[in-house]
Amino acid sequence: MAIFFVNQGATYKEERMGSYLWAPKLDKSGHKNCGYELMKEIHKGDFILNNADGKIVAISIANEDCKSKDQPKELKEAQTIYEWDNEGWFVPVQYYDFPHPLKTSDFQDWLKDNPDKDSAFDKNGHPKLQYLCNLTSEHAKHILEVSLKLEDDPQVRNVIESALELQK
């Protein structure tokens, strides 16, 4: 099992309500995008940290492997600036909302001191500007440990602990 980091921003509400992740197969220029292509690597049981508006707001678990699926109706109707291709990658997920969302800026200094070009954060500790990113074990462990200290919901804690077990 793997752990990923998704930047949902403008589509978080729709994806959360629908219990899925969705990304177009091609960007608006008709090219493949590494953040969209990475969706194909999500498999049943993988963990995803959900980032929206500068906060990690949930952890989700993939219910199935990624599959090809047209853009969900609610995303087409959402008031966003994005005009996506209709063909996309879809993963049904179970969201576990963080009662105490984590501001990514709260651990920015740690990320700057522990950079990794293969992770979801740039050298300045900011989330990379792409939809889906890999999350290195070291970065995942740090974020999960911080979140575990804050969360008191037993179900959310259990999911975080399960994700942490993968990082050992």
For the regions a protein language model found, what residue spans apply to each?
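Short beta-strand or tight-loop elements
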Residues: 44, 58, 89
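Short, Lys/Arg- and Gly-enriched loop/turn segments at beta-strand edges
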Residues: 55-61
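Surface-exposed, flexible loop/turn segments at secondary-structure boundaries
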Residues: 11-12, 56, 68
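Aromatic- and Lys/Arg-enriched surface recognition patch
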Residues: 61-137
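Compositionally biased, charged N-terminal/linker segments
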Residues: 1-44, 97-102, 106-109, 134-168
